[in-house]
């Protein structure tokens, strides 16, 4: 029974699941958009939105927390210098998810595109 279990496991252990979201978040920050399955996109949304909210604070402590969670200083720097200032006036809702028409070959998983609402081109 799944009583009081809020997170999806994606059939991975905790460390593997964290690594999955860190890598997807890095790709999203560097490229502005990522194509993945719909459940992963929905889970990634909450992970990334918490990071952007932290980066908006613009304190040394928040910068260290972002770098610690992303495990990459270059990506963290891009997040709090380029992306976070775009969302200074916005209180959440930094990403949008589009459902894609074609399904994944093999298991037929529903594909989605997750992107930042305002991203510099």
UniProtKB/Swiss-Prot annotation:
Cystine residue pairs: none
What InterPro entries is this protein classified in?
Ribosomal_bL17, Ribosomal_bL17_sf
Alphabetical GO biological process terms: translation
Q: Give the domain of life.
A: Bacteria
State the SUPFAM superfamilies in the record: Prokaryotic ribosomal protein L17 (SSF64263)
- UniProtKB keywords: Ribonucleoprotein, Ribosomal protein
Pfam short name (any one)? Ribosomal_L17
> Which Gene3D superfamilies does its entry note?
Ribosomal protein L17 (3.90.1030.10)
Answer yes or no on keyword Oxidoreductase: no
Q: Which GO terms describe its molecular function?
A: structural constituent of ribosome
Q: Does the keyword tRNA-binding apply?
A: no
> GO CC: one term?
cytosolic large ribosomal subunit
Assembly and interactions? Part of the 50S ribosomal subunit. Contacts protein L32.
Stated family: Belongs to the bacterial ribosomal protein bL17 family.
What name is this protein filed under? Large ribosomal subunit protein bL17
Q: Which organism is it from?
A: Sulfurihydrogenibium sp. (strain YO3AOP1)
Quick one: which gene encodes this?
A: rplQ
């Amino acid at each position: 029974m799944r009583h009081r279990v809020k997170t999806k496991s994606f059939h991975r252990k905790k460390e593997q699941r964290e690594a999955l979201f860190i890598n997807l978040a890095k790709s999203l920050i560097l490229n502005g958009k990522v194509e993945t399955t719909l459940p992963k996109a929905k889970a990634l949304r909450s992970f990334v939105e918490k990071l952007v909210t932290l980066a908006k604070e613009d304190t040394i402590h928040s910068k260290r927390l972002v770098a610690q969670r992303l495990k990459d200083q270059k990506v963290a720097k891009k997040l709090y210098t380029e992306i976070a200032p775009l969302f200074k006036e916005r209180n959440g809702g930094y990403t949008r998810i589009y459902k894609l028409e074609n399904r994944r070959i093999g298991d037929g998983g529903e594909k989605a595109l997750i992107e930042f609402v305002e991203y510099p081109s």
